[in-house]
Every structure is written in C-alpha cells, then in structure tokens.
From Swiss-Prot:
Name of the protein in its database record: Ornithine carbamoyltransferase
Subunit structure: Homotrimer.
Gene of this entry: argF
SUPFAM superfamilies, alphabetized: Aspartate/ornithine carbamoyltransferase
Role this protein plays: Reversibly catalyzes the transfer of the carbamoyl group from carbamoyl phosphate (CP) to the N(epsilon) atom of ornithine (ORN) to produce L-citrulline, which is a substrate for argininosuccinate synthetase, the enzyme involved in the final step in arginine biosynthesis.
Thermal activity characteristics from the UniProt entry: Optimum temperature is 65 degrees Celsius. Highly thermostable.
Class of this enzyme: transferase
Entry keywords, A to Z: Amino-acid biosynthesis, Arginine biosynthesis, Cytoplasm, Transferase
Taxonomic lineage of the native organism: Bacteria, Thermotogati, Deinococcota, Deinococci, Thermales
Length: 301
C-alpha cells in the first residue's frame, strides 16, 4: 500500500511509546483501509502466529481475515497445543516462533506472558488481550467514535462497569486522542488510580452521574474469562450497574452505546440496548478488522 511509512514501536502490548501523532496516523490508516475495502499483497509470504490461551470470536477472526486481505497467512495455536508457560517456557516458545513466523499475536491470561514474548522474540508481538490491556479493542473504539462524531477531541465517554483491561486501554488512549472519560464502578472494582490520573478521568460510584450528558456509554461483561469462581459475588456487587434503556436516556440526544462483546444479556446490559437505535456495537466489531489491518500492515511490513 502506498503512502508515507508509519513508524511505531516494535510491539503493541499497550500504548506506551505512542504519542498523539502515532495514534492518529494508525487511525487514519485504518480509516483508509476501510474506505477502500483494501485487499493487497503487502504481507505476501508472511505468517502471523496466533498464540491463544483464551477462546475468541472477534479477535481471532479479524486477525486471520486481516492477514488474508493483506496477502499473508495466520497459524492458530491454542493452549492445548502449546502449553505456554506449562509444557514449554515462554522464552522457549518465543525463540521457536521467531524462526517460523514474521509476527506473534498473543491472547493470554497474564500480561507478564505477552511482555516475556516481546522481550525474547525478535519479531513483533501484538497483545490480543491480557488481564491488563486490550489495545486492539481500544483502536476499534476510537475509530467507531471518530466515525460517529467526526472527530475525537472533547468527546465525553462514560464507562459503567468493571475497572478491567478494556477500560485500562481506553484510559491509556484518552489523553492521546483528547477524550474525556467518566468512570463508574462498584466499590472494590476501581481501575488503576495512576491510569485515572494520567487520563484526567472523572470517577464516581454512581452510574447515572457518569452517564449524564455523555457522548457515549461503554460497558463490558461483569465476569471476564478466568473469573468464573467470582461470578456469584460479582453479580451481587454489580447490581445497579446495568446499561439499559433507562441509563441510555441520560446521554446526549446523539449519544451512542458501546460494548466490546460478548454481551451477557440481563447482566451488564440488555438485548434491547445492544440491538437498539443508540447501539454502535457491531460497528465496533467490524472496526476490529480495519484497525487490525492497520496494526499488522505497519508492524509486519
């Protein structure tokens, strides 16, 4: 693909090493790829290893399809096959894969695993989700908001729910994109105070206070993969934090609903919200593809 070359850090584990210019350039590239429905041979002959400890619909599919659309291939390796950190040390997995492939996308339980992969592998490593961050999701979120509102600077985005990895990445990109984030979580489920401070985010334990007048209202599941033993307690603790039609009424008239999916209806949201007129949930899902293309095209080319 023609155009000015974009230089980014070797790995995308989170957004450290990114400034407003790098983030904007990546989003601009994703917009262009989407607009042109781009297909090319930029990554012809190149292979991406998908090293997944967790199951996935959007992340696996979009990364595989992105590689196909760019002329490359993806190889899927799940935990049963590899046993990363169990059957074989992370360092050894990294040193093997760097001999076979041009990049690694890792979906892991512990962020330390993806950090170790990046430290030991000479090829680029992309964090396809860890307990600390979900950068690919944050890029899709930003692209969706930009499409809806025409820009990002000054938008107020409310987060209602768990102070989890998706929120962490949103807080990371907020100051780079000029977003104003308003966060509401139950007591005991707050995000990293350092991230809140760096994002200059507003924090409350009241969902209505966070949602009032926002451009977008964002939520995620109350119980993430690996937290199943906490499910009953979480269901109790998160009562009152459901994003439903009543809470969505507090947004601006043009306000939209975001969810990274999968959705657990009757818990953090409702079927009516996800499939309602304010929802941009499936635009977010589609934009996972275009932003994945932008990342892979930049890091692997």
């Amino acid at each position: 693909m023609g155009g000015e070359a974009l230089t980014l850090p070797k790995d995308l584990l989170d957004f450290s090493g990114y400034g407003p210019k790098e983030l904007q350039a990546l989003l601009d590239l994703a917009e262009r790829l989407k607009r042109e429905r781009y297909r090319g041979e930029d990554l012809k002959g190149k292979v991406l290893a998908l090293l997944f400890e967790k199951p996935s619909l959007r992340t696996r599919t979009t990364l595989e399809v992105a590689m196909v659309h760019l002329g490359g291939h993806a190889v899927y390796l799940d935990q049963k096959q590899v046993g990363i950190g169990e059957r074989e040390p992370v360092r050894d997995v990294a040193k093997n894969l760097e001999r076979f492939v041009e990049g690694i996308a890792a979906r892991v339980f512990r962020h330390e695993t993806v950090e170790a992969l990046a430290r030991h592998a000479k090829v680029p490593v992309v964090n396809a989700l860890s307990d600390r961050a979900h950068p690919l999701q944050a890029l899709a979120d930003l692209l969706t908001l930009k499409e809806v509102f025409g820009g990002l600077a000054g938008l107020e985005v409310a987060w209602v729910g768990d102070g989890n990895n998706v929120l962490n990445s949103l807080l990371e990109v907020a100051p780079l994109a000029g977003l104003k984030v308003r966060v509401a979580t139950p007591k005991g489920y707050e995000p990293d105070p350092g991230l809140l401070k760096r994002a200059n985010a507003f924090f409350t334990h009241d969902p209505k206070e966070a949602a009032l007048g926002a451009h977008a209202l964002y939520t995620d599941v109350w119980t993430s993969m690996g937290q199943e033993a906490e499910r009953a307690k979480r269901l109790r603790d998160f009562q009152g934090f459901q994003v439903n039609g009543e809470l969505l009424k507090l947004l601006r008239p043009e306000g939209v609903f975001l969810h990274c999916l999968p959705a657990h209806y009757g818990e953090e949201t409702t079927e009516e919200a996800v499939h309602g007129p304010r929802s941009r949930v499936f635009d977010q899902a589609e934009n996972r593809l275009h932003t994945a293309k932008a990342v892979l095209l930049t890091l692997l080319k």
